[in-house]
Structure formats: C-alpha cells, structure tokens
Amino acid sequence: MNTLLAKKKEPIDKLAAASAGGRSLGAEAFRRMLRSPVAITGGVITLLFLLLAIFAPLIAPKDPQIRYLQDQVELGKGIIPGPSPGFPLGVDDFGRDFLSRLIVGAQQTLLVGVLATVIGVLIGVIIGGLAGAFGGWVDTVLMRLVDVLLSFPSLLLAISIAALFAKPSQWTVILAVSIIGVPIFARLLRGSMLAQREADHVLAATSLGVKRGTIVFRHMLPNSLGPVIVQATLTLATAILEAAALSFLGLGDPDPTRAEWGLMLGNASRQFLDIRPELAYYPAIAIIVVALGFTLLGESLREALDPKNRR
C-alpha cells in the first residue's frame, strides 16, 4: 500500500514543477530580457552600481574621512574649494574629497536598501504565507493588519516610524523602510497562495492525504514566490529613494563622518546650496539613476515572466 501511494505521489511533484515552469521558463525569460533594450539598460546600471558599492574602498581615490582642505573652507565667507586636479568634484564643508565620499556612499546606500528589502520580504512572506495557507480567521486578522498599513502613504508611514525613535540611526531607517514594504509582499504572496490552493497538483496531493505542511512548503510556497521576487527588485528602488528621503529630512544616521547619499544631499541642501549647489546635484543624480536602474530591471523581469507575453 505504501509503495502504491509513493508511486501515486511522484506525478504530483512533476505536475508542480510543470506549473512553476521549471528551468525552461527561466531560460525563456532570460532570453526575452536580453532582447529588451530596457532590461539591458536597467541591468547595466544595476551591475555598475553593485560593482561600485562592493569595491568602493578600492575605487575611491582618497580616504573619504580625511579633511584634506579643511583650512581652506570658510562657510561664513562662502568659500568651499571647487574642483581641482587632486579633487575632481571638489570638497565638502569639512574639506573631504567629495568624489571619494560619493563612491563610498554607494556602499551605504546599497546596504540600507538591501537590508530593508530583505527584512520586508521575510516578514511579508510569513504573514502572506500564513494567511494564504490557513485562510479563515487567520487570513481575516492578518489582512486587516495589512490594510491598516496600506491605508497610510508609504513615505508618511516611514517618517512616522522613524520619528518614534529618540535617537535616529541607520537601523531606524532600515526598520522604517522595511515595514512599509511588508503589506505589499504579504498581499502578493497571499494572492499567489490562494491561486495555488486550486492548482491541480495541490488538489491531487490533498486527495492522496499528503500532510498540510508538506503541501504548503513543497507545492504551494515554491510556486508562489515568483511575483514576490519580481516585486523585491522594484521595492529595492523604492527603498533606496525612501531611505535617502529619511536621511535628507534628518531622520537617518546623524553621524557626519558617514558617507551616505541621502545624508550628503541633505547636508548640501541645508548648509551650502547657495555656495556649491553641484554638491547637492551629485548625490541626487546618483540616487535617481540607481533607482531608475532597479525599476527598469524589475519591470523588465515582470514582463518577461508574464504568461501573456509568452510566445
């Protein structure tokens, strides 16, 4: 009897793999993205940003913390040394090389964006998975909580969460940005899980008496993560923008020695925008370009995986 049951269960796994698309679907999506100028543009921007962030300490021409020209800075007189052979973008109000700080700032920006996105995905997957797997009152309670979070504008919610902490830090920014991403991932996974409950391989497993936990973790959850992965790419762009906004508003890490694009933009805008406005433009442009890269890549990935676009 056990042997017969095991033989019946084998086609279930094959059916589940077929519904997920397997490697062929991933390869087809990858080929479609290679033919898309939008995907290539987003991929190139994202790759360059990742390389810059990973190897920032090696790429930066100077130490971003050393105050090379501090003796030449006179904010009261409106004097901040501009570009020179040794300092292509000039220096900031502490006399530190601005190009080096801009390069090293990519590392901090990536760290905040990735951590906020990962935390948001993990919490959202747990909430959405529980709601989709159990349904009933569990689904009702969790989704009402999600609705409460969705009722607030994302940036306003992030500001409110960050403002709750007496001492702002990098972790308060990560926590605030991650929380606003939770309801998005929770709803996405819940919807996918509900659709999977009616899939053929899940119904077959249920009829054969497979344990509920096995059905959820082996058949439903793996086949429901596709939309979450795509959304994570898009959310990373949003996380970078919102983290920069919090730092710009003074709700991030106030440490002046930390090189972070949002903090650099905020300091330049508040203290010496009329003296050296380009020092505000550089981090602003960097934030916009990186967010655009992740957005283009995420949208291209979504289109490539969309069943309606398969040929």
What are these language model-derived features?
Residues 55, 107, 149, 153, ...:
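Residue-level hotspots within pore-lining transmembrane alpha-helices
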Residues 88, 92, 98, 119-126, ...:
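Generic hydrophobic transmembrane alpha-helix motif, especially the helices
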Residues 107-123, 213-246, 294:
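Transmembrane alpha-helices
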Residues 150, 162-165, 193, 235, ...:
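Glycine-rich helix-loop "coupling/hinge" segments at transmembrane-helix boundaries
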